[in-house]
Every structure is written in C-alpha cells, then in structure tokens.
C-alpha cells in the first residue's frame, strides 16, 4: 500500500525508448547538415540521395492513390487531380495541354519549399526536388517524358517542368 492507505504504484517497463533531441527539434538545421554532408561526400552521395528522394515521391503518391475511392481504375483526369492536389501542397501550379497522341503537363513552381537553401546548395536542392517530383509522376503515368525547362538555380523566379504523358 501507498501513503495514507492508498494503493501503491505499479511501475511497468516501457516498450518504447525515451527520445532525446539535441539540439532542439529543428528541421532546417537537419536539412542544412544533410545538404552539407551530401556536398562533402560528392557525386555518389548525391546519387543515393536522389534515389531516396525519388522513392519518397513514389511512396507519397502511392498513399494518395490508395486513399482515392476508385484507386483500381484511375482515369487520366483522376491521376491529374491527385498530382495537382499533391503539387498544391508545396507550391506547384500545373497547366495541362493536350493533343491526340499525348498530353502535356506544365508545372511552374513559384514557391520552392527549399528556397532558403538555394544560396549554398542550389544544385543539390534542385536535383533532389526534381527526383521527388519525377517519382510522383512515374507512379501515376507509366509512359512519360519528364523535362526541366528552367529552375531557380539559374536566377529564375520559378522552376518550370514539362511532362509529356503518352496514351
């Protein structure tokens, strides 16, 4: 028994460990350190980071597709809606043009989520961002041609991508 006749405490071992965070949780510092590490380790590290970014883009789109009510029979317009909704979360503004053999998607990115890191690590940031978007597009459209037209790395106000989706 415990104090004053109350029942004593029963302590149990916690299944999950205790997490320490040093320094405080700061995603921008983690991003900065990761970019510095990729920069220092060179091309092989960048290629591995691009693979990770690409797979993350694919997995993100797989989750969005799975949550769609008709995920087994997605039409072009359904896929476009999924891509557009995903794109809007991070500042993409898509425009669609079509012809008889293919449809062209034009993405202009006016609000890069990583613009703070462009000063020191523009090449890395742009390549990782592009591979993420490429992963999302490849998950939705099997036959596509993905082309970067321009990006903020070259002092542009926005990034521009064209995606040709073949029927």
Region locations from a protein language model:
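Conserved segment of winged-helix/HTH DNA-binding domains
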Residues: 2-43
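Broad gene-expression machinery/nucleic-acid interaction feature
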Residues: 8-10, 104, 158-160
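C-terminal edge-of-domain segments
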Residues: 156-167
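Beta-strand residues in well-ordered beta-sheet regions across diverse protein folds
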Residues: 12-14, 108-110, 162
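Coil-to-beta-strand transition motifs
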Residues: 141-144, 154-158
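A short beta-turn/loop motif at secondary-structure boundaries
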Residues: 2-5, 99-101, 151-155
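Mid-protein regulatory/catalytic core that forms ligand/cofactor-binding pockets
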Residues: 36-148
């Amino acid at each position: 028994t415990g104090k004053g006749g109350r029942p004593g405490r029963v302590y149990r071992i916690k299944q999950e460990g205790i997490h320490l965070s040093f320094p405080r949780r700061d995603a921008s510092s983690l991003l900065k350190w990761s970019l510095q590490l990729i920069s220092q380790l060179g091309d092989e590290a960048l290629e591995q980071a691009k693979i990770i970014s690409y797979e993350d883009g694919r997995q993100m789109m797989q989750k969005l597709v799975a949550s769609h009510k008709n995920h087994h029979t997605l039409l072009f317009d359904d896929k476009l809606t999924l891509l557009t909704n995903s794109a809007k979360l991070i500042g993409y503004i898509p425009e669609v043009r079509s012809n008889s053999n293919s449809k062209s998607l034009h993405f202009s990115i006016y609000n890069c989520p990583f613009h703070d890191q462009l000063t020191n690590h523009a090449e890395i940031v742009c390549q990782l961002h592009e591979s993420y978007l490429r992963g999302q597009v490849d998950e939705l459209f099997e036959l596509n041609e993905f082309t970067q037209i321009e990006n903020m790395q070259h002092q542009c106000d926005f990034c521009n991508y064209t995606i040709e989706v073949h029927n």
